[in-house]
Amino acid sequence: ENPECRAYLLDVARHWVQEFDIDGWRLDVANEVDHEFWRDFRRLVKGIKPDCYILGEIWHEGMPWLRGDQYDSLMNYPLTQAITDFFALGNDDKTSFINAVTRSYLAYPRNVNEAMFNLLESHDTTRLLSLCGNDKRKAKLAYLFMFTQVGSPCIYYGGEVGMDGQKGMGLELNRKCMIW
């Protein structure tokens, strides 16, 4: 709402795209910012670099941001939740799992699903292996399922080597240094 803040942030976006030719933006807690700002942001960024990728972090259904005037994609946390609830935590039976996955796909048109950013862990979540109780078989099944889904799969650093780590209650062990 503050015009000076808005102008500053748009200038930052312009600077990074023009000066450093970045390929995309990952926008944290993106649903906390006014839609009109994101429309201006997209017009500016795409005006400089039409193929610059704009990814928003929204933890719930986000169709209002995916109508072609704000983001190109979202982090697909509804699918994340369905997969981790079933494979890692064992919270759902098969029918509940199928229903949760189906709901995550029915929330969007096919072209949007094809661009969704599918993930099983991030800097904001407990790592998958920890959710699985360090059962690598469960983690592998969860990744296998994710990799077979429509959308773009993403592995949070360390997931590929089985890093663990809890998130919450003041712990940030999900952000520990990479095992090299």
What are the residue ranges of the model-derived segments?
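Aromatic/hydrophobic pocket-lining residues that form the small-molecule binding cavity
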Residues: 9, 38, 139
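Active-site-proximal helices and loops of the catalytic beta/alpha 8
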Residues: 18, 28-111, 116, 135-136, ...
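Loop/turn elements at helix/coil->beta-strand transitions in domains of secreted/extracellular proteins
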Residues: 21-24, 49-52, 150-154
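Short catalytic-loop micro-motif centered on adjacent basic/acidic residues
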Residues: 24-30, 129
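Substrate-binding cleft of secreted/luminal carbohydrate-active enzymes
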Residues: 143-146, 150-164
